[in-house]
């Protein structure tokens, strides 16, 4: 295992690129949110609070605009771009990402999420960083395996930059993109993600804590509860994946996608008139559940409306991340089940239930169980004592999911 100067230099450059991309997209996202929902950083409002304070019609209109911009934009990108290549395909070396098409595609994701698309923002900086890195490494005579490693590190560093989460982003790179834990890959991922986080912090974003609230108490009776919660979350994830697989397949370059997008986002806007927290990636919903500042009936409504909103956005051909939407689904399901448990069996901390539910739903839905355990602690800066119920719930959920999937596969 040799670290030549050129490879180390490229790792540093890629980290800086991802950091600048993450900072740029963060500022762009906030600027769009401030413009659309008429608030500024001086108001000291979260996006969720800003959306909740406007009238229902002022939530509907931006979503109609969002559907129009997204529908037209993605049809144009698919018709006239050089082809949208996903990160895993690029890392595998099967196809290269075109930097211009990729950056335009990623920027459109940020624009639509800023307006109110119910998908996440994290795919955009990952894709843009990987696309720019693909262009960069073409100009260097390096081995194919190093090229793949650099592209994967760029994608992971984009995640680190936008969420201020260097360790979990490095684990994500290894767990989901490279599928290896060798020292060369680990050192590259850790250095790249750490540098990207540093650059973003220095570029006006700062050391942001995504969830600034007190850690929920573990309470009592949480061992048995955590195990059963894992089974409930697993069932929820399996059903969510099934509903996604049933969505109609329409070629995204077809002009028919434009009216479909407008109608789908209009329906999302109608849902947002009653459940404003579904707009954006889902952070607003998590802020309510983690602090238990929500009734179980409203949590159930948020769970169902976010589920439908994500399916509508995907039907519309929209792109975006699934990390925070998955967290929001898990946190609301955790609140609902925790309430039922507290009534029927024994008291349980609903804040803990929501937090653990978010971690485990994310881990299963995005197939990154190790990443999600660390990711949520980095986002919240909660104590590592939360890892105990997380481990119990995640372990049970993974087992139950595999059992259900094997039965479904054998039934086909």
Language-model segments: what does each one mean?
Residues 1-412:
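Alpha-helical transmembrane segments and immediately membrane-proximal extracytoplasmic
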């Amino acid at each position: 295992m040799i670290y030549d100067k050129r490879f180390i230099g490229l790792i540093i450059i890629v980290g800086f690129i991802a950091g600048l991309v993450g900072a740029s997209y963060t500022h762009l996202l906030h600027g769009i949110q401030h413009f659309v929902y008429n608030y500024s950083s001086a108001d000291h409002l979260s996006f969720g609070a800003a959306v909740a304070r406007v009238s229902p019609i002022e939530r509907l209109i931006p979503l109609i605009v969002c559907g129009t911009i997204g529908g037209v934009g993605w049809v144009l990108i698919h018709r006239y771009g050089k082809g949208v290549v996903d990160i895993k395909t690029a890392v595998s070396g099967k196809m290269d990402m075109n930097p211009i098409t990729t950056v335009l595609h990623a920027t459109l994701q940020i624009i639509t999420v800023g307006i109110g698309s119910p998908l996440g923002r994290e795919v955009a900086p990952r894709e843009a960083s990987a696309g720019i890195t693909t262009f960069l490494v073409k100009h260097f005579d390096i081995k194919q395996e190093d090229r793949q490693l650099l592209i994967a590190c760029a994608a992971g560093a984009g995640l680190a930059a936008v969420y201020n989460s260097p360790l979990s982003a490095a684990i994500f790179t290894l767990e989901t993109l490279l599928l290896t834990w060798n020292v060369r890959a680990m050192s590259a991922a850790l250095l790249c993600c750490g540098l990207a986080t540093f650059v973003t912090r220095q570029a006006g974003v700062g050391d942001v804590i995504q969830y600034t609230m007190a850690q929920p108490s573990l309470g009592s009776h949480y061992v048995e509860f955590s195990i059963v919660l894992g089974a409930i979350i697993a069932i929820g994830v399996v059903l969510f994946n099934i509903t996604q697989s049933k969505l109609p397949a329409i070629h995204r370059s077809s002009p028919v996608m434009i009216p479909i997008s407008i109608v789908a986002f209009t329906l999302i806007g109608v849902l947002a008139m009653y459940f404003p927290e579904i707009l954006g990636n889902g952070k607003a919903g998590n802020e309510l559940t983690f602090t238990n500042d929500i009734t179980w009936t409203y949590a159930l409504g948020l769970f169902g409306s976010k589920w439908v909103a994500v399916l509508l956005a995907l039907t519309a051909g929209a792109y975006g991340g699934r990390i925070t939407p998955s967290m929001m689904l898990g946190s609301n399901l955790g609140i609902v089940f925790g309430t039922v448990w507290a009534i029927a069996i024994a008291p349980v901390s609903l804040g803990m239930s929501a937090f653990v539910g978010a971690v485990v739903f994310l881990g299963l839905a995005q197939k990154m169980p190790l990443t999600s355990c660390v990711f949520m602690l980095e986002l919240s800066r909660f104590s590592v004592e939360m890892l105990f119920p997380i481990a119990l719930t995640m372990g049970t959920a993974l087992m139950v999911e595999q059992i259900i999937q094997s039965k479904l596969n054998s039934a086909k």
